[in-house]
Amino acid sequence: MAGWNAYIDSLMADGTCQDAAIVGYKDSPSVWAAVPGKTFVSITPAEVGVLVGKDRSSFFVNGLTLGGQKCSVIRDSLLQDGEFTMDLRTKSTGGAPTFNVTVTMTAKTLVLLMGKEGVHGGLINKKCYEMASHLRRSQY
């Protein structure tokens, strides 16, 4: 899906994000495009299943993983019409910095963004939401 890489380039262009991915979640979940060598390129079908699944309470207690990176859920509106967003924060290991993550949903895809250190979650959310809105208008 080489055409999807242009969307990743667009999301990464302003330098506020360190990782981005577009993941297809219908039928057989898979990463359509992602930043090479980063976390989101390794997202598994099981991780996608947790994101889009009906159980919306367990990850508030246990967190969830994206590409093996543990995350805490801050706000879950992923399945709410008009919202379609989930805000997360990476969990720290050994005092490492944590980062804001937003996941947005379209009819066929999940758009994931991870901000750089110190980048406000609201900025990441807005950028991710705008890309998802564009994809929804394009019937994705």
UniProtKB/Swiss-Prot annotation:
One of its GO terms (biological process) is positive regulation of epithelial cell migration. Keywords: Acetylation, Actin-binding, Cytoplasm, Cytoskeleton, Isopeptide bond, Phosphoprotein, Ubl conjugation. The keyword Transport does not apply. Pfam families: Profilin (PF00235). Phosphorylation at Ser-138 reduces its affinity for G-actin and blocks its interaction with HTT, reducing its ability to inhibit androgen receptor (AR) and HTT aggregation. There is a cross-link at K54 (Glycyl lysine isopeptide (Lys-Gly) (interchain with G-Cter in ubiquitin)). The modification Phosphoserine is found at S28, S57, S138. It is found in: Cytoplasm, Cytoskeleton. There is a cross-link at K54 (Glycyl lysine isopeptide (Lys-Gly) (interchain with G-Cter in SUMO2)). GO terms for molecular function: actin binding; actin monomer binding; adenyl-nucleotide exchange factor activity; phosphatidylinositol-4,5-bisphosphate binding; phosphotyrosine residue binding; proline-rich region binding; signaling receptor binding; small GTPase binding. GO terms for cellular component: cell cortex; cytoplasm; cytoskeleton; glutamatergic synapse; nucleus; parallel fiber to Purkinje cell synapse; postsynapse; presynapse. Its main location: cytoplasm. The modification Phosphotyrosine is found at Y129. The modification N6-acetyllysine is found at K108. CDD domains: PROF (cd00148). Gene3D superfamilies: Dynein light chain 2a, cytoplasmic. Found in a complex with XPO6, Ran, ACTB and PFN1. Interacts with ACTB. Interacts with VASP. Interacts with HTT. Interacts with SH3BGRL. Occurs in many kinds of cells as a complex with monomeric actin in a 1:1 ratio. Interacts with ACTMAP. Binds to actin and affects the structure of the cytoskeleton. At high concentrations, profilin prevents the polymerization of actin, whereas it enhances it at low concentrations. By binding to PIP2, it inhibits the formation of IP3 and DG. Inhibits androgen receptor (AR) and HTT aggregation and binding of G-actin is essential for its inhibition of AR. Belongs to the profilin family. This is Profilin-1. The gene is Pfn1.
